[in-house]
């Protein structure tokens, strides 16, 4: 406890106190839209809802905020809000969108500065590659094969609005910004749906997504902070990846309150974290806690996490939100992949010398597959096929040129293959390629009022090459002169790319409208 109090005092000097004045700078809103604003000239900004906005409206919003008592009245009397101008729906929608995006940019600045000044990044080789989504899968392949039990955790909710405001107090003590945050939380009518369901983080109105995503990440980082801190204190190894989470100033006060509710709880639970083979992974409102310990230890972990959420965040967590399974008897949906460690082992045959004995070794395998149903459903929502997977034309693209249509379909196909290159079974991906290829042919045939057969004969190999993925090109070069290789075979080579930093909209069904 004394060690943490000293660390907490050290982190106070890194806090940023004045970020609110940045809301009066026009370039902040230009950054929010990733579009340049040139003085007073009207510049069209295409927001997420495809509506045109002018930089003149940004200037009007800044002038309104400069006027005395406008923001104070907006916070104290939200029903009589004149800042967002509810009398005009267009102004109200634009002001709420641009102000929330600008506020999200401003509150992210202290965290970004802390990450830039964090020395741990320089100590980790190829740190940029660790930002890839796929970088976690080689880690799982290497570590999960030796573990026994898996805990599926749904990060608890709901949480009170004031707790979210307090979470930002640890990052910044700019009081006006905190008041403005309260205004946004109580202003948006869809706030309750965000907290009530983790799926709705992808279904929010797009103009609010950045702000609410930042608040959600702040809440989750606070939830994980306690686990990371205890593991760092009990482990002999230094966790270089937890530095950005250890920026809190009143954690010692919470620990004192925690100790009053449970005397000696801190000392009794520290041994939970002494297992060097305990691994924690979080994704999309869910978390996985894998360990080599016994079933009794995992049950104690479950009880501890339930009590921790109840007394650390002051709300009740249902025990059913934490499921315990043996690793060999369970599978988990992770970033679009269905991952598991099958009971059947993989036979590996080794031979040290040419005429020596053959040594058969059986080892576990970390299996990653792709389910066809969610991806076909995504293509169906995007109007590339029916719900049963029957390809259809894309009428809204018939006004484009032939090469633009080919390029769009080919790019979607390559992106899906690129993201799911780690799948051990490629049959699902080839089914998606068939759907996209035939949908493209039907779109072109509809544009030229012809048949699919005629267009396929006219384009020939050019049409097929557009859907030729990078992975298949690599395999074709490897196996052209050695063995017969079929792209539609059952090869199970897994390739993980380190340039994927986000989930594609077609990959993640929740992002589709």
Curated annotation (Swiss-Prot):
Q: Where in the cell is it found?
A: Plastid, Chloroplast
Return the Pfam families for the record. Intron_maturas2 (PF01348), MatK_N (PF01824)
Please state the protein's primary subcellular location: plastid
Q: Sorted alphabetically, which keywords does the UniProt record give?
A: Chloroplast, mRNA processing, Plastid, RNA-binding, tRNA processing
GO (cellular component) term, any one: chloroplast
Q: Which InterPro entries match?
A: Domain_X, Maturase_MatK, Maturase_MatK_N
Q: Which GO terms describe its biological process?
A: mRNA processing; RNA splicing; tRNA processing
| One term of GO molecular function | RNA binding
Role description: Usually encoded in the trnK tRNA gene intron. Probably assists in splicing its own and other chloroplast group II introns.
Similarity-based family: Belongs to the intron maturase 2 family. MatK subfamily.
The record, for HAMAP family, names: MatK (MF_01390)
- Give the protein's recorded name: Maturase K
Which organism is this protein's natural source?
A: Zea mays
The gene behind this protein is matK
């Amino acid at each position: 406890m004394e060690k943490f109090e000293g660390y907490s005092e050290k982190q106070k000097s890194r806090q940023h106190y004045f970020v609110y004045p940045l809301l009066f700078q026009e370039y902040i809103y230009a950054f929010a839209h990733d579009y340049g604003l040139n003085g007073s000239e009207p510049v069209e900004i295409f927001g997420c809802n495809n509506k045109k906005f002018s930089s003149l409206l940004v200037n009007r919003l800044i002038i309104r905020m400069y006027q005395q008592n406008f923001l104070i009245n907006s916070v104290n009397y939200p029903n009589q809000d004149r800042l967002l101008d509810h009398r005009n729906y267009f102004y109200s929608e634009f002001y709420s969108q641009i102000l929330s995006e600008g506020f999200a940019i401003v509150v992210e600045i202290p965290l970004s500065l802390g990450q830039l000044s964090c020395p741990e990044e320089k100590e980790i080789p190829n740190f940029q590659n660790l930002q890839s989504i796929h970088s976690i899968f080689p880690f799982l392949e290497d570590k999960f094969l030796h573990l026994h039990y898996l805990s599926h955790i749904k990060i608890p909710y709901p949480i009170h609005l004031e707790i979210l405001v307090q979470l930002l107090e640890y990052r910044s003590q700019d009081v006006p910004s905190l008041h403005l945050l309260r205004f946004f939380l109580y202003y948006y009518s869809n706030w309750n749906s965000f907290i009530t369901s983790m799926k709705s983080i992808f279904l929010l109105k797009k103009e609010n997504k950045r702000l609410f995503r930042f608040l959600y990440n702040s809440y989750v980082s606070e939830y994980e902070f306690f686990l990371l801190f205890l593991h760092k204190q009990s482990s002999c190894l230094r966790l270089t990846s937890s530095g950005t989470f250890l920026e809190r100033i009143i954690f010692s006060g919470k620990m004192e309150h925690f100790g009053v509710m449970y005397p000696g709880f801190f000392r009794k639970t520290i041994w939970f974290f002494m297992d060097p083979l305990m691994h924690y992974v979080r994704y999309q409102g869910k978390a996985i806690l894998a360990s080599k310990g016994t079933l009794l230890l995992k049950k104690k972990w479950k009880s501890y996490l339930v009590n921790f959420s109840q007394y650390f965040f002051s709300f009740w967590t249902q025990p059913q939100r934490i499921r315990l399974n043996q690793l060999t008897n369970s599978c988990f949906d992770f970033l679009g992949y269905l991952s598991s460690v099958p009971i059947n082992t993989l036979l590996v045959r080794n031979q040290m010398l040419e005429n020596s004995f053959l040594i058969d070794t059986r080892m576990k395998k970390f299996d990653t597959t792709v389910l066809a149903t969610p991806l076909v459903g995504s293509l169906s929502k995007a109007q590339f096929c029916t719900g049963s997977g029957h390809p259809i034309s894309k009428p809204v693209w018939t006004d484009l040129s032939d090469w633009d249509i080919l390029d769009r379909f080919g790019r979607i196909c390559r992106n899906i293959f690129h993201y799911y290159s780690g799948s051990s079974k490629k049959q699902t991906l080839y089914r998606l390629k068939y759907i996209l290829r035939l949908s493209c042919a039907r779109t072109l045939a509809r544009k030229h009022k012809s048949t699919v057969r005629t267009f396929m004969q006219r384009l020939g190999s050019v049409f097929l090459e557009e859907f030729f993925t990078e992975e298949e090109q690599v395999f074709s070069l490897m196996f052209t002169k050695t063995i017969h290789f079929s792209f539609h075979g059952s090869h199970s080579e897994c390739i993980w790319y380190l340039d994927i930093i986000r989930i594609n909209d077609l990959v993640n069904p929740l992002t589709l409208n």
